Amino acid sequence: MIEVQEFRAEVRQWLADNLVGDFAALKGLGGPGREHEAFEERRAWNQHLAAAGLTCLGWPVEHGGRGLSVAHRVAFYEEYARANAPDKVNHFGEELLGPTLIEYGTPEQQKRFLPKILDVTELWCQGYSEPNAGSDLANVSTTAELVGDAEASGATGNQYWVINGQKVWTSLAHWAQWCFVVARTEKGSKRHAGLSYLLVPLDQPGVEIRPINQLTGDSEFNEVFFDDARTEAGLVVGQPGDGWRVAMGTLTFERGVSTLGQQIRYAREHSNLVELAKRTGAADDPLIRERLVQSWTGLQAMRSYALATMDVEQPGQDNVSKLLWANWHRELGEIAMDVQGMAGLTLENGEFDEWQRLYLFSRADTIYGGSNEIQRNIIAERVLGLPREVKG
């Protein structure tokens, strides 16, 4: 296996050689709250990365990846962030569904879907959240029923799943071809029991996708309605009724080594905010200076924690990481608004536009991917061994 520093140098040089021409215009585009930016152009960039063998780095070689270590992947994400390269468009496929299929999927599912994730020809979205469930992921009301003739031919015959229900806050659904959906497949089941993890094609009459207008004026999220939508009987990952275990497995992949690359981007945002404070005169305010110093200290603490735990698997470490970066980024957004002063009250304001968008989207940082309250409950109950929260 290539040495980490040699691989880091390879990535740095490749990015310098390739993030040029039309691709240079994509620098800094995409990411949370900005997924709509130059989407098709970023897809082309993502395919360019794939052709160079710079996607799916941690996947096993037999599944098309490079089988690289956590340290190699950290090096990639750090160099990628330092180059200000555009956010990838196939996050859900490369970092969530792909590893899930490798861990829980059948050989047939792996053969069918992994190559198209690798070459970025099929995009995926995540069908977890529901409108009446809040942060309670187990409160699933979307249903799926297996119908058809099981005896017609083969193990599942002519059977297929019929899906009804609604998912919400579904990022990238209006660009994706497929959605991995958690649905209730056992009538009368409650909570974690009776759930299944289904792979559902979105281009069919039984699926309606409605973009949600955000505070920023963009539409990155969607509502997805399933009205007798169908998917093949064999497109359940794991066993029917075992969907909770598979879904939790997917979530363990969600908060991975990309966090260190994310922190490089945060460091750039912090540096840019310091420069803005100097230009506007806000840096003359001792309270602003103190908050900027505290923010920088928090960023270093996050990085130290991520480096110390990247090779360690223990309960709660991902939850602590999520709490750290979500709170840090929300506070940075608040500092940015104060640095702008009265100019921060209007959205279309040239130089300040990016900071207002950062502030608006950072309000969601402590909610999506598991709210702060959920993270604290998990840490308290599963790590510290405290009594479970009393339900009202």
Swiss-Prot record:
GO terms for molecular function: flavin adenine dinucleotide binding; oxidoreductase activity, acting on the CH-CH group of donors. The keyword Flavoprotein applies. Its EC number is 1.3.99.-. FAD binds at Q126, G127, Y128, S129, S171, S371, N372, E373. Coiled coil: none annotated. It catalyses: 3-[(3aS,4S,5R,7aS)-5-hydroxy-7a-methyl-1-oxo-octahydro-1H-inden-4-yl]propanoyl-CoA + A = (2E)-3-[(3aS,4S,5R,7aS)-5-hydroxy-7a-methyl-1-oxo-octahydro-1H-inden-4-yl]prop-2-enoyl-CoA + AH2. Disruption phenotype: Deletion mutant grows normally on glycerol but shows impaired growth on cholesterol. It accumulates 5OH-HIP in the culture supernatant. Its cofactor is FAD. It holds the Pfam family Acyl-CoA_dh_1. Binds 2 FAD per heterotetramer. InterPro entries: Acyl-CoA_Oxase/DH_mid-dom, Acyl-CoA_Oxase/DH_mid-dom_sf, AcylCo_DH-like_C, AcylCo_DH/oxidase_C, AcylCoA_DH/ox_N, AcylCoA_DH/ox_N_sf, AcylCoA_DH/oxidase_NM_dom_sf, Mycobact_Acyl-CoA_DH. One of its GO terms (biological process) is cholesterol catabolic process. Pathway: Steroid metabolism; cholesterol degradation. The active site is at E254 (proton acceptor). Transmembrane segments: none annotated. Keywords: Cholesterol metabolism, FAD, Flavoprotein, Lipid metabolism, Oxidoreductase, Steroid metabolism, Sterol metabolism. One of its GO terms (cellular component) is plasma membrane. Heterotetramer composed of 2 IpdE1 subunits and 2 IpdE2 subunits. Involved in cholesterol degradation. Catalyzes the dehydrogenation of 5OH-HIP-CoA to 5OH-HIPE-CoA. Belongs to the acyl-CoA dehydrogenase family. PANTHER family: ACYL-COA DEHYDROGENASE, ACYL-COA DEHYDROGENASE FADE29. This is Acyl-CoA dehydrogenase IpdE1. It comes from Mycolicibacterium smegmatis (strain ATCC 700084 / mc(2)155). The lineage of its organism: Bacteria, Bacillati, Actinomycetota, Actinomycetes, Mycobacteriales. The gene is ipdE1.
